[in-house]
Amino acid sequence: MATPNSGRAASVYSEVQSSRIEHVLPLPSVLNHPFKIVQGPPSSAAGNPDEIAKLFPNLFGQPSAMLVPDVADSLDSNQQLKIGLVLSGGQAPGGHNVISGIFDYLQDRAKGSILYGFRGGPAGIMKCNYVQLTADYIHPYRNQGGFDMICSGRDKIETPEQFKQAEETAGKLDLNGLVVIGGDDSNTNACLLAENFRSKNLKTRVIGCPKTIDGDLKCKEVPTSFGFDTACKIYSEMIGNVMIDARSTGKYYHFVRLMGRAASHITLECALQTHPNITIIGEEVAAKKLALKDVTDYIVDVICKRADLGYNYGVILIPEGLIDFIPEVQNLIAELNEILAHDVVDEGGLWKKKLTSQSLQLFEFLPVAIQEQLMLERDPHGNVQVAKIETEKMLIQMVETELEKRKQQGTYKAHFKGQSHFFGYEGRCGLPTNFDSTYCYALGYAAGALLHSGKTGLISSVGNLGAPVAEWTVGGTALTSLMDVERRHGKFKPVIKKAMVELEGAPFKKFASLREEWALKNRYVSPGPIQFMGPGSDAASHTLLLELGSVA
């Protein structure tokens, strides 16, 4: 066990950081008064319920739980709990407040309880590497960004040996409960742990908390994942700044790639906040079966129309996962992986004859720098490293080539200069917004209540988020109800399905209704930095409010 000295020195904090530490967070009113937990109807699964039932015989079908007011507390306040918690996966603003919420619940409702933080993600559970979290240890991290209180990791508890290590740690620390703070993969893992512990009759219960800036872990009961609000506001501030720069110089097109490996939620939200000239949404590209040339032509068409209006500048938003949405690119990558696994690339290019005609055509269409990247950048398994392809730079080069053609045809007479940006890591550890700070604190407090009542295999759920905080609802949703199965290595594996951008959903429909106007008229919005007081300080994301029907 580590010595409980906090890793942060609040003495060197900025005035804003110091004021955030002392910021008192409101709680949903149900958590401020005596409550009891009521159960909902039996649950099913997001897909293939029969297979999920086989994989989770002890948990499948369990009802969701809801906290409702009561005349007196139904839980034993004298029960001293031992709770462990772990941060899993990439950072997201607000994680420290989930921890603060769990700690404060135990202080308020189960005095004398102990809270352990496992260091470095799930590996900390397997190695029994932990720190006891005290009021003094937690204090400098309240309302602060980052995961550095205990740090995170991407290990998974998957093999029988690893499950045994987790069981040993739970037994050694005599844990009543474990909270897994993570995204879709981490919460799938949390459910497997809960099932394993229950099958062995261990007393350790497991509760998940929904974390990911990508915004792709959500459902009716879990309206948003924490961190999305803050990350989008950080990116939108920077996009707004770039827009004013574009307008000021009048000569650059800024191509901005935004984090989000699968879903395009961040790109869509930032578009709604800032009104760029062009926004590519991966899910729409996939639905329309667009080729890379179609995407390029769309961008070039807008640039030409803007040039006719005298605008030789603009801002273009691109989701990080765009490549994954274009089937022809996926086919090319699959063919390259196969060829390069068996052949040496000869300089004469004879290896290209092994590509299908469609893939060869696409390969020749790509800029030389991207061709080289596809050939040379391999992961340890020998596969093309798609994540390393700088899509924004690739598109700039392809747009340049197409505009040159149009110049020669006489249909484009202006000058084009592209500037590339990637906004990613900047958004993962910022000071959480008032929304994320409060939402995370409530998620943590709810996780404490669910464990105190003996629940397991649920994800902490805070709803009615369009209303004032006092009216937010609090409960837990069966993790198995979010699950489907995927076939991997001939076996069914449980997965929480990522929530993708819905083209029939309110956020996309609003964007689609405005994008033509944004393309040709400069409707730029500069949201400015995140506010903690005054105008806009308590505003939730456009995506959340549109999905909840709280705004038109």
From Swiss-Prot:
Allosterically activated by fructose 2,6-bisphosphate. Keywords: Allosteric enzyme, Cytoplasm, Glycolysis, Kinase, Magnesium, Metal-binding, Transferase. Diphosphate binds at residue 90. Pfam families: PFK. It is found in: Cytoplasm. The record marks 211 as: Important for catalytic activity. It comes from the Eukaryota. GO terms for cellular component: cytoplasm. Its cofactor is Mg(2+). Belongs to the phosphofructokinase type A (PFKA) family. PPi-dependent PFK group II subfamily. Clade 'Long' sub-subfamily. Catalytic subunit of pyrophosphate--fructose 6-phosphate 1-phosphotransferase. Catalyzes the phosphorylation of D-fructose 6-phosphate, the first committing step of glycolysis. Uses inorganic phosphate (PPi) as phosphoryl donor instead of ATP like common ATP-dependent phosphofructokinases (ATP-PFKs), which renders the reaction reversible, and can thus function both in glycolysis and gluconeogenesis. This is Pyrophosphate--fructose 6-phosphate 1-phosphotransferase subunit beta.
